[in-house]
């Protein structure tokens, strides 16, 4: 015997059939990732203008699942990360050396132990000054 579904039973049946499959879930993050600087070290011109030379340690690039970027960079004498717009907040933290940070036309000197918190929408950059390389940590959300 064939029974036709009509009304609410038909609507319930069609709704159940039309429910999309759940989206695939990303792989779970591991308990931790340990990264050696030497494994992520690259000598290259700095970003945003390629002014001079630098050493970059793209620490967070070695992490499979991440919520922010964490990089160490040494700007060699005379080099700079050129002025560029940012679409996220960003932090420059100086480990050693001296530099001048730029944000929307304002400039400030940074030395070891100082940080610049830079806001979304700003035009930012930093240049090395002084006799030693400017070594800094740069942190920001991914995709920036």
Where do the model's predicted regions map?
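Glycine- and acidic-residue-biased ligand/ion/polar-headgroup-sensing regions
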Residues: 87-99, 104
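Compact, glycine-rich, soluble single-domain proteins
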Residues: 59-60, 80, 104
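Bacterial N-terminal signal peptides
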Residues: 5-16
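Conserved short histidine dyad/triad with adjacent acidic residue
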Residues: 69-86
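A short, N-terminal "cap"/entry segment at the start of jelly-roll beta-barrel domains
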Residues: 18-67
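Ligand-binding loop in jelly-roll beta-barrel domains
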Residues: 65, 120-144
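Short acidic-glycine-tyrosine-enriched beta hairpin
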Residues: 106-121
